[in-house]
Amino acid sequence: MKAVIFAYHDMGCQGVQAVLDAGYEIAAIFTHADNPAENTFFGSVSRLAAELGIPVYAPDNVNHPIWVDRIAELAPDIIFSFYYRNLLSEEILHLAPAGAFNLHGSLLPAYRGRAPLNWVLVNGESETGVTLHRMVKRADAGEIVASQRVAIAQDDVALTLHHKLCQAARQLLNSILPTMKCGDIPSVPQRESDATYYGRRRPEDGLIDWHKPVSTVHNLVRAVAAPWPGAFSYNGSQKFTIWSSRICPDAQGALPGSVISVSPLRVACADGALEIITGQAGDGIAVQGSQLAQTLGLVAGARLNRPPATSGKRRIRVLILGVNGFIGNHLTERLLNEENYEVYGMDIGSNAISRFLLHPRFHFVEGDISIHSEWIEYHVKKCDVVLPLVAIATPIEYTRNPLRVFELDFEENLRIIRYCVKYRKRVVFPSTSEVYGMCTDASFDEDKSNLIVGPVNKPRWIYSVSKQLLDRVIWAYGEKEGLRFTLFRPFNWMGPRLDSLNAARIGSSRAITQLILNLVEGTPIKLIDGGQQKRCFTDIRDGIEALFRIIVNDGDRCDGKIINIGNPDNEASIQELATLLLDSFDKHPLRCHFPPFAGFQVVESRSYYGKGYQDVAHRKPSIDNARRCLGWEPSIAMRDTVEETLDFFLRSVDVAERAS
């Protein structure tokens, strides 16, 4: 039986080995690239796959149609997911005739969702387990195939329980996988009335509330002990982390948060005292409790506290859906540079925003807007400004997958717009320069230019008309129901983190990334229809500054406006862009690590994009609205943008890959 496996972490390693031991053929393994902001104490699935000689991949979005097609070509009989962190689309789940099965770290239907290992300890459970279940669209809701119970000892902490669960998982898989291989797959429906769901835990969730019962505080310490981030408190403004503790029943009448003694170090809770066995001050080293008290300058009777409150008015909360994308991650950086903004974000990956994950004003949830509607509705209600940036926005996908473009770019975003109407929230919506279509004006005016597209049998226009229809719906909601909105239309923004060379390898990237990939790999640069199409290329820094000013919205000048954001002075054909890029490439200090230039190759758009494609000769913005509403003027020359973008991608190529 041929299997495709999605796996990560120690559980992923156990699962891969168990599938092999049961005699399955593994066609491919899909995993994640390690996040540099995460403490990777666990085993590497990618390394294990490499050692076993099994093809392994770590795509940013495994649900992308390109990857769905690749998995379909593998023709799996069965699919397994062992602690893979992203939900799999229904298209993938339906690829295997025998079904798709997930290993979950709890006794389902209890503790569905994220971090069940930590949550069972937080809640003081005495038992947990592992469950193998059939995968359906809803997370962790499919029929149960098998489960194994695990007792939780009073001295168990997150790491010891993790090891127990890994051992239980291996025993479970060793028992059930041979049976499944023979076609005998048990199926027991979950009782929805018994289901509980828990969300992702964040480092800040480790903050101790000394007014809680001592058992609650002690369980929190157990649940997030090393290598997790730890439970923490403050002495004045100094943060300290508690790595291990024990319960003392007598608080001697002290107020919660009061230091009862320093040797041993004991702190009063609501109904007892917590003895701190080991801890750490700030970024220091772990020490025993009495030494920690000395380091912190604690004395009996001192009061521990919550972090100092920030003064001034409440920060502006900005919700960014698609926060890991090109615009989303650059906008996040700009907002976090200002003290009065707090960013809430969702995306299906976090590689581009890993540098923000520990920022106290950045709150990220990994998820899919087509699945996590409850989370989105709650955060639309909670936040002040909403930016729905999720979209399929690469031309080749318009002809490859027009229905997917419509479903995501229009239908899913319309639901978000309706939430904004319902909760009366301001929306800053990304329209696109594509809505102008084949407009013949010398420069495109937001309020006067006609929006002209081709015939229905050219699916290339599905993106343009999906965005245009949303523009019109948003405008109507503004006119009829008072929705506060601004539509912005980016014109060919470029810069670091635009997309990835891997995306270019599967044909799903912007033009400049594809050109850079050709230079990196020594393949000919393809000029579609000779590369005579002209565009106005805009530096991401210029674009983000304009977008930031839209969010600031001085004097409400942006309300109800459509604003082009582009650089009319940076007009160039694709051929001119390629020539400029080649010149910068030849001058780059890393040039010697890459193959010789393979030349230009002229190709027809039909052969590259498919029969449903039409191109546009020019696309130049009028930026009068941006000047008037934002006081904004683009300033960065195209050569500077090209050089910075090229440098980013060249330095992202592995040294060994350059040499090969």
From Swiss-Prot:
Catalytic activity: UDP-alpha-D-glucuronate + NAD(+) = UDP-beta-L-threo-pentopyranos-4-ulose + CO2 + NADH; UDP-4-amino-4-deoxy-beta-L-arabinose + (6R)-10-formyltetrahydrofolate = UDP-4-deoxy-4-formamido-beta-L-arabinose + (6S)-5,6,7,8-tetrahydrofolate + H(+)
One of the GO biological process terms: lipopolysaccharide biosynthetic process
Cited CDD domains: Arna_FMT_C, Arna_like_SDR_e
EC number(s) from the headed UniProt entry: 2.1.2.13, 1.1.1.305
Site feature: Transition state stabilizer: N102
Disulfide pattern: none
Residue positions binding UDP-alpha-D-glucuronate: 393, 398, 432-433, 460, 492, 526-535, 613
Keyword terms of this UniProt record: Antibiotic resistance, Lipid A biosynthesis, Lipid biosynthesis, Lipid metabolism, Lipopolysaccharide biosynthesis, Multifunctional enzyme, NAD, Oxidoreductase, Transferase
A cellular component term, taken from the record's GO annotations: membrane
Functional summary from the UniProt entry: Bifunctional enzyme that catalyzes the oxidative decarboxylation of UDP-glucuronic acid (UDP-GlcUA) to UDP-4-keto-arabinose (UDP-Ara4O) and the addition of a formyl group to UDP-4-amino-4-deoxy-L-arabinose (UDP-L-Ara4N) to form UDP-L-4-formamido-arabinose (UDP-L-Ara4FN). The modified arabinose is attached to lipid A and is required for resistance to polymyxin and cationic antimicrobial peptides.
Assembly information from the UniProt record: Homohexamer, formed by a dimer of trimers.
Family of this protein: In the N-terminal section; belongs to the Fmt family. UDP-L-Ara4N formyltransferase subfamily.
Name recorded for this polypeptide: Bifunctional polymyxin resistance protein ArnA
Organism: Salmonella agona (strain SL483)
